């Protein structure tokens, strides 16, 4: 009997700790994504607007049969000039943060839903074996499914970054120009870019094996990522232009010849994009470290307050004794009385667990402490038999 009670009580306490810890981890991750996205959104907005501007200028130059290769200093100068124009007044600074709400929602949803969908598909197995190809297929399906729902957010975000308009105006323009399907105008390019994201780690591991590299460094991964980004850069620009509603390729042009003389832009934009992603990752990790303890303490205090609200409703041992003696025959009262005392004592000590924050302070659960406390409950429990 004691073993059964110990298991039930331990399971309930661990479940309580797991639920609070899971909520704390989710809140921390969401906070980190939101802050890192807000920190780097102005630079991302500037790069997006420059990509659209260069694509439009290239399309106009094709009509005029004139070409010109931009130098890195020209691109950097355009970035500085565009940033200076928007920093001068309040309206310009607001334009830099246009689309921030959609960016945060999109990043948060993708970072949390893609692993969840992948885990759900993996749990169902789908009659597939655990091979690299099947794992890659599940990753692609997960990303494609989630991005099907987040693509409208990406379209609205880019439109707002380019035009600086509000969400309602942007949505009205899209619906008036292309209908509801306009919200998914760049979904095809998004799917191809999903393939890049899923295949890149596999290619990196294959190259490591091929070259006999025992250790894979960050530099090697960045070089491979830069090569992959350079290959699909034109497609990435096409995605941005489709979302922005800007025509970047003239009639009869092929995707491969869109930026024949703009490789300088390609290389610089790839480097800036990688820098942006590295900064976002580092800032996200830093924010996670800073906010984890704060969120944990907040969740712990919330749990403590909830249990404190329930504590006055706990019956005292004397009230339990009187109630059992009034409603149960004398022959059966003692076992029920012992059980009632035991459960009342267990609930009170459970409140003590939450107040001390067992298992929450380190974003995990202290199984040993919980087990020891459950052992105390069992020792205080009624004797068998």
UniProtKB/Swiss-Prot annotation:
Similarity field: Belongs to the mitochondrial carrier (TC 2.A.29) family.
Gene3D superfamilies linked: Mitochondrial carrier domain (1.50.40.10)
Example of a GO MF term: ADP transmembrane transporter activity
TM annotation in the entry: 30-47, 132-150, 184-207, 263-279, 294-310
Job description of the protein: May function as a mitochondrial transporter.
Cell location: Mitochondrion inner membrane
InterPro entries: Mito/Peroxisomal_Carrier, Mitochondrial_sb/sol_carrier, Mt_carrier_dom_sf
Record's bilayer topology term: Multi-pass membrane protein
Name of the molecule in the record: Putative mitochondrial carrier protein TRV_02148.2
Major subcellular site: mitochondrion
